[in-house]
Amino acid sequence: MLSNFIKGALASIVFCASVWQVQAAEVIKLAHTANISHVHHEAAQLFAKGVAERTQGKYEVQIYPAGELGDQPALAEQITMSALDMAIVSLGNMAMYDRRLNAMTAPFLFKDYDHAHRVIDSFVMNWMNKGLAQYDAVGLSMFDYGFRQVTTQDIVVNTAEDLKGVKIRVPPSTGLMAAFDALGANTQKIAY
């Protein structure tokens, strides 16, 4: 009779232990293609820390840097297939799924940073997400890399006319390539 009591007590203790054990955090996979000293990685780390703190450890963001899970087009594709939870990719890569997003890669859209952030935060994010919804993709925010400069080896570019016939290397963004083509430049697509 005592052994039955002990068995019952042990079973109760094991049951209680399983009820009281800490639940493992739900993992969110976030990938990017930059090295670990890049601002994308720093932003990913800050995001992961914020998620852990604000959810009190319920969620853990695992970061896959430096292209561990693929290049930007592959990461964008994984997002649309629900094979990856989050990624930091260029707008040009998401434009593969909604061509209208190419409009945001055109040069000379904004007069300054304040103007850019007002437009992006109030209108562009909602507009962009409507187009990406059919792919189960949602943009949370946009990075800016600063206003772009045109850099050439030996030609000074002060006006759009100065670009006529000049070879310009651009990321594989349909919108960016079309904009420079329209300005008369000879665009060359680079790996990005």
Regions found by a protein language model. Give the residues of each.
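Sec/Tat signal peptide C-region and signal peptidase I cleavage site
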Residues: S18-A24
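Extracytoplasmic small-molecule ligand-binding "clamshell" domains
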Residues: L46, E53-R54, E60-A87, F110-D112
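Short, well-ordered beta-strand segments
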Residues: K29-A31, Q62, A87, R169
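Short, polar/charged alpha-helical segment
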Residues: S37-Q62, S122, G175-A178
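Extracytoplasmic "Venus flytrap"
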Residues: K29-L46, A66-D71
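Bacterial N-terminal signal peptides that target proteins for export
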Residues: M1-L10, W20
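Contiguous mixed-secondary-structure segments that line small-molecule binding/active-site clefts
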Residues: K49, T80, D85, S90-Q188
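Short beta-strand-to-loop elements that line the ligand-binding cleft
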Residues: V61-G70, I168-V170, A185-Y192
